[in-house]
Curated annotation (Swiss-Prot):
Flagellin is the subunit protein which polymerizes to form the filaments of bacterial flagella. Important for motility and virulence. Pfam families: Flagellin_C, Flagellin_IN, Flagellin_N. This is Flagellin A. It is found in: Secreted; Bacterial flagellum. Coiled coil: none annotated. It comes from Helicobacter pylori (strain ATCC 700392 / 26695). The keyword Secreted applies. GO terms for cellular component: bacterial-type flagellum; extracellular region. Belongs to the bacterial flagellin family. It comes from the Bacteria.
Amino acid sequence: MAFQVNTNINAMNAHVQSALTQNALKTSLERLSSGLRINKAADDASGMTVADSLRSQASSLGQAIANTNDGMGIIQVADKAMDEQLKILDTVKVKATQAAQDGQTTESRKAIQSDIVRLIQGLDNIGNTTTYNGQALLSGQFTNKEFQVGAYSNQSIKASIGSTTSDKIGQVRIATGALITASGDISLTFKQVDGVNDVTLESVKVSSSAGTGIGVLAEVINKNSNRTGVKAYASVITTSDVAVQSGSLSNLTLNGIHLGNIADIKKNDSDGRLVAAINAVTSETGVEAYTDQKGRLNLRSIDGRGIEIKTDSVSNGPSALTMVNGGQDLTKGSTNYGRLSLTRLDAKSINVVSASDSQHLGFTAIGFGESQVAETTVNLRDVTGNFNANVKSASGANYNAVIASGNQSLGSGVTTLRGAMVVIDIAESAMKMLDKVRSDLGSVQNQMISTVNNISITQVNVKAAESQIRDVDFAEESANFNKNNILAQSGSYAMSQANTVQQNILRLLT
């Protein structure tokens, strides 16, 4: 080994190693003081990239959780508001049911109608004033809204809230045909009740015999309403064209039961002789009689069977009755199998065909002419005003005529019996619509809850993954620090010894 003075290789080596140790010691102190393994890109370039990506993902997930909670807050505000609206609709239905019985007077029905109008106004007020951050929720404007629920773009949940004001809910499709005057068997098929499938009902015989008639058909339709979505109402009423006149009836026959001659009938049947004679055989004919305020004779089927009535010409005086049902001559016989009203609790058309006529839809298939059907759609807002002639006709309130001209107005809301029945259906339809909206929102809220649960766990796992990369292992780094600290001390000693060794060369000069 050569002895050199100008270059102290040992000292240089000791210095280099001490410098490396100082750098390692500096890194250890930086990590221990910051708690991070990666304090700069040079510490772990690829690890820093992954850690920064994970940190960004975790931060975005935190905001996504906040977004989802905001969305659930919006849904809860709307849900509670609709809950109040449903309570209002339930009250409307109860009051309409209260009005749907003839123990009510016109004045009491008007009082009930006033209550209903106020309730609907309250419902509209809720629909128009329920807001979140200035956005109306129940007016129909809150549609196709998105809530970002992920760390990356287009990871969103969409939500829409339909309008719940009275002009947008409670749609009811009602249709009524003219008098059925032909007997026979009717087998109905409701087309595409769920958009795809048809429902065929059992065959019903329409006649004037017991256990048959349009009333039985209505019962068959109603017991299948859960499958078809359609309810039926049958009305079999024969009405004289004019008031009962003073006179007699000859050889009166009603639904095959011979009542014979009825003499000395007074005008408007003021002494009830004609009505009493007919009602005496109600158990056999299935028909009850009464006179209305105009003095006209009304025959009503109590079980929905048809009404067949015939008299002979009176030879020795005036006849008390000559025409019924808008021009049917009693001497030629009057046949009335009634009117059928169908109601669907939405705005969709009622598509029905019969086995005998599968080419026509609707009432034409049952035996009505093309122009012998009144149809219309009403909604909850219509309850607050007067029902127009179209509603009167389509609801069957005018009894024997398809069009309501010449009949008294149906009035407003529940101020008439038939109007109250219509309001019951409207309220039920409105409740179903609100329940559907609430159900959809409930599904969205459940989706949001599941999303929050998932991304909360994901956020924790992402932070854990970032921590594995970015955070320092204190046990490991403490060991490194202690090692480097000892090396630093030994390095200082080594440098001093290297200088001492170099001084030994001076002894050669002595």
